[in-house]
Curated annotation (Swiss-Prot):
Protein name: Dihydrofolate reductase type 2
Record annotation: effect of changing residue 67 to H: Increases affinity for dihydrofolate 36-fold. Increases affinity for NADPH 110-fold
Catalysis performed (reactions): (6S)-5,6,7,8-tetrahydrofolate + NADP(+) = 7,8-dihydrofolate + NADPH + H(+)
Domain remark from Swiss-Prot or TrEMBL: The active site is situated at the inner surface of a pore formed by the four subunits.
Keywords: Antibiotic resistance, Methotrexate resistance, NADP, One-carbon metabolism, Oxidoreductase, Plasmid, Trimethoprim resistance
Residues annotated for substrate binding in this entry: 68
Naturally occurring in which organism (per UniProt): Escherichia coli
Pathway the protein contributes to: Cofactor biosynthesis; tetrahydrofolate biosynthesis; 5,6,7,8-tetrahydrofolate from 7,8-dihydrofolate: step 1/1
Binding site for NADP(+): 32-36, 66-69
Role according to the record: Key enzyme in folate metabolism. Catalyzes an essential reaction for de novo glycine and purine synthesis, and for DNA precursor synthesis.
Pfam families: DHFR_2
């Protein structure tokens, strides 16, 4: 199988580290502040030009379902 010139030759694998100034950590319980309800645990993070701090949240009600949200949309719960 041939590779195109824009393919990644060495995929990234293994552990990654949250930024040192992250608002939430892996496993923290959070919920959306408004709009459609979503509550669960932090399972990852992301950043883009428009969202410098965002999180992946796995639903407690529907295990395996994950949504991504900017930090401003989430609040910590106990």
């Amino acid at each position: 199988m041939e590779r195109s010139s824009n393919e990644v030759s060495n995929p990234v694998a293994g552990n990654f580290v949250f930024p040192s100034n992250a608002t939430f950590g892996m496993g923290d319980r959070v919920r959306k502040k408004s709009g459609a309800a979503w509550q669960g645990q932090i399972v990852g993070w992301y950043c883009t030009n428009l969202t410098p701090e965002g999180y992946a949240v796995e639903s407690e009600a529907h295990p395996g379902s994950v949504q991504i949200y900017p930090v401003a949309a989430l609040e910590r719960i106990n």
